């Protein structure tokens, strides 16, 4: 890999930054960042071949506008957080003097509209999930009101078999 310098392409910098921060992040956080960087952020900026030193707030803003055609505002907010953090590190190690993401309008979060399954839909969901790797997370989510991220983020250490409790973090 190329050494980190300001002439590095932003897309290449992101790949190297991911390796640098990997030891400092929880596994689930790293997986989330990695997914966003690999699937959306790198492909967009790689196609535009923008050097880190030449990255402008408008480049980032146009990325957000492009992504809002594909994903929710909430997802683009997550992209913003990752890009901002990556560029903050670039400033810290003197690759760039300012963080262009500071000058970008953060996308608005989509309003949450809750929905729920009725008893027949729940029965169909349980039947469809039976015997799959999703059976337990779906069961826990349904009976304990867990969010998707809470259900998939559960660890054995969260279960206290002596006191029959489950700790959600």
PLM regions with names:
Residues 18-95, 111:
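N-terminal core-binding DNA-recognition domain of tyrosine site-specific recombinases/integrases
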Residues 7-13, 49-52, 155:
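Short, structural beta-strand-to-alpha-helix junction motif
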Residues 8-15, 61, 77-84, 102, ...:
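Non-catalytic, well-ordered alpha-helical scaffold segments
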Residues 1-7, 19, 23-24:
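N-terminal helical hairpins
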Residues 73, 77-79, 92-98, 102-154, ...:
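Basic, Lys/Arg- and aromatic-enriched nucleic-acid-binding interface segment
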Residues 1-5, 161-169:
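Short, intrinsically disordered, charge-balanced linker/junction segments flanking boundaries
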Residues 13-14, 56-60, 118-121, 133-134:
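N-terminal alpha-helical segment
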